[in-house]
Amino acid sequence: MAVKIKLKRMGKVRTPQYRIVVADARAKRDGKAIEEIGKYHPKEEPSLIEVNSERVQYWLSVGAQPTDPVRHILKLTGDWQKFKGLPAPTKPLKVAEPKDKEAQEAAFQAVLKELVLPGSENKGGKSKKAEEKSAEKTAEKSEGEA
């Protein structure tokens, strides 16, 4: 049985996300796969590439043929050079910077302060009408007691 390592398309329209899969060469692009060995999300900045290197090396060693796009991805990760016995790639993969949650929270709070109009803040979560009614009731009670 001829086995290929190929990309299985997932995601939405104009937002492709791919799974790197091992499948029979005769199977459809998005058909049944033997094994899923990685992910590729080209629309993210930088592109997300996750590959299970151990499984890739196994499938290449038993004769699985990568398609051209997968071969390019494997060259970027260094798995193709490892299989062929070539030197590792000189250009390292770009890694996304971790998101600073404190900075995001501060920016979010700043936007919230801009959206809330001065003098319209409701403390206690009651609306103006509800506050007026409660004030009238307390005034009536105090008059009735006196």
Swiss-Prot record:
Gene3D superfamilies documented for this protein: 3.30.1320.10
Single Gene Ontology BP annotation: translation
Keyword DNA repair carried by entry: no
A GO cellular-component term linked to this record: cytoplasm
Coiled coil stretches, renumbered: none
Region described as Disordered: spans on this chain: 119-146
SUPFAM superfamilies: Ribosomal protein S16 (SSF54565)
GO MF annotation terms: structural constituent of ribosome
Transmembrane segments: none
Pfam families membership: Ribosomal_S16
Entry-linked PROSITE patterns: RIBOSOMAL_S16
NCBIfam families hit by this protein: PRK14520.1, S16
Family the UniProt entry places it in: Belongs to the bacterial ribosomal protein bS16 family.
HAMAP family given in the database record: Ribosomal_bS16
Protein's UniProt name: Small ribosomal subunit protein bS16
Native source organism of the sequence: Thermobifida fusca (strain YX)
